[in-house]
Amino acid sequence: MLSKELLAALNEQMNQEYFAAHAYMAMAAYCDKESYDGFANFYIEQAKEERFHGKKIYDYINDRGEHAIFDTIKAPKVEFSSILETFKDSLAQERDVTQRFYNLSELARNDKDYATISFLNWFLDEQVEEESTFETHIDYLTRIGDDCNTLYLYEKELAARSFNEQ
């Protein structure tokens, strides 16, 4: 059985994952509006991944005999000045999520809830990958700058991204 504090924190994180999916869809909409189809695809696939994370937490809460509680999801930011800004915002969001998982892990450790600690380790590993991915994209976009030809090729690469549940 999960402690009340840990259950509340897991429910909050589940909702945060669904907010992240909304935020990535807002970024996809910006990219589509600006005719960056490859970047839009990247963010659509990223949103699928975040929904998968939310469902994973939902399943865990229910598997532990508790009740997953859905809350109102606030509206995400919808206006951006550039593709680079979307990636910088994404990195900030992922860093916030990483900190949330650290806090969840600390709660689970304090509760000596070893099953939850094990469950959360998957997310901690995932967050290392997420942050690295966005840092790399920011580096590439910064180097590309205003080079339209290179940006076009990079966008085509991102158009091929496809999320596969693991």
From Swiss-Prot:
<feature type="binding site">
    <location>
        <position position="94"/>
    </location>
    <ligand>
        <name>Fe cation 2</name>
    </ligand>
</feature>
<keyword id="KW-0408">Iron</keyword>
<keyword id="KW-0963">Cytoplasm</keyword>
<feature type="binding site">
    <location>
        <position position="50"/>
    </location>
    <ligand>
        <name>Fe cation 2</name>
    </ligand>
</feature>
<feature type="binding site">
    <location>
        <position position="53"/>
    </location>
    <ligand>
        <name>Fe cation 1</name>
    </ligand>
</feature>
<dbReference type="GO" id="GO:0005829">
    <property type="term" value="C:cytosol"/>
</dbReference>
<dbReference type="Pfam" id="PF00210">
    <property type="entry name" value="Ferritin"/>
</dbReference>
<feature type="binding site">
    <location>
        <position position="50"/>
    </location>
    <ligand>
        <name>Fe cation 1</name>
    </ligand>
</feature>
<dbReference type="GO" id="GO:0008198">
    <property type="term" value="F:ferrous iron binding"/>
</dbReference>
<protein>
    <recommendedName>
        <fullName>Bacterial non-heme ferritin</fullName>
        <ecNumber>1.16.3.2</ecNumber>
    </recommendedName>
</protein>
<keyword id="KW-0409">Iron storage</keyword>
<dbReference type="InterPro" id="IPR012347">
    <property type="entry name" value="Ferritin-like"/>
</dbReference>
<keyword id="KW-0560">Oxidoreductase</keyword>
<keyword id="KW-0479">Metal-binding</keyword>
<dbReference type="GO" id="GO:0006879">
    <property type="term" value="P:intracellular iron ion homeostasis"/>
</dbReference>
<dbReference type="GO" id="GO:0006826">
    <property type="term" value="P:iron ion transport"/>
</dbReference>
<dbReference type="GO" id="GO:0008199">
    <property type="term" value="F:ferric iron binding"/>
</dbReference>
<comment type="function">
    <text>Iron-storage protein.</text>
</comment>
<dbReference type="InterPro" id="IPR041719">
    <property type="entry name" value="Ferritin_prok"/>
</dbReference>
<dbReference type="InterPro" id="IPR009078">
    <property type="entry name" value="Ferritin-like_SF"/>
</dbReference>
<dbReference type="GO" id="GO:0004322">
    <property type="term" value="F:ferroxidase activity"/>
</dbReference>
<dbReference type="InterPro" id="IPR008331">
    <property type="entry name" value="Ferritin_DPS_dom"/>
</dbReference>
<comment type="similarity">
    <text>Belongs to the ferritin family. Prokaryotic subfamily.</text>
</comment>
<feature type="binding site">
    <location>
        <position position="17"/>
    </location>
    <ligand>
        <name>Fe cation 1</name>
    </ligand>
</feature>
<dbReference type="InterPro" id="IPR009040">
    <property type="entry name" value="Ferritin-like_diiron"/>
</dbReference>
<dbReference type="InterPro" id="IPR001519">
    <property type="entry name" value="Ferritin"/>
</dbReference>
<feature type="binding site">
    <location>
        <position position="127"/>
    </location>
    <ligand>
        <name>Fe cation 2</name>
    </ligand>
</feature>
<feature type="domain" description="Ferritin-like diiron">
    <location>
        <begin position="2"/>
        <end position="145"/>
    </location>
</feature>
